[in-house]
Regions:
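Basic/polar low-complexity intrinsically disordered segments
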Residues: 1-113
Length: 113
């Protein structure tokens, strides 16, 4: 069964893609890598905890006198702002990566026919 007939990328296309990836790597150089152990130990923000976190940040900013001095509300707000800003980029990259992997699989499958 042929799923994918052709994908034609020129040398110029490959060069432009490599340049674009280099730009992304440069602009996203502050992204971190975590080990499997670190990943397991991190708190994960799911849908319910995200709502709770957002509401808590609002409550903390509205009631600064109730917050312990060692809690940096401004830093938490900056983290949430960066979380929000990064999310749409991750969604686009994830979708693009999925399409690239599907195309790679289809090309390999077609080549085996």
């Amino acid at each position: 069964m042929v799923i994918f007939s052709t994908l034609t990328l020129t040398e110029a296309d490959h060069a432009a893609i490599a340049d674009a990836l280099s730009t992304l790597e440069s602009k996203l150089s502050a992204l971190i890598s975590v080990s499997a152990d670190q990943r397991r130990s991190l708190n994960k923000m799911g849908e319910k905890s995200e709502t709770f976190c957002r509401r808590t940040l609002v409550a903390m900013s509205e009631n600064p006198g109730l917050i312990p001095a060692d809690v940096d509300v401004a830093e938490a707000q900056r983290d949430m702002a960066q979380f929000d800003a990064l999310r749409p980029h991750i969604a686009r990259l994830t979708k693009l990566l999925g399409r690239a992997e599907d195309s790679e699989m289809a090309l390999g499958s077609d080549a085996m026919v």
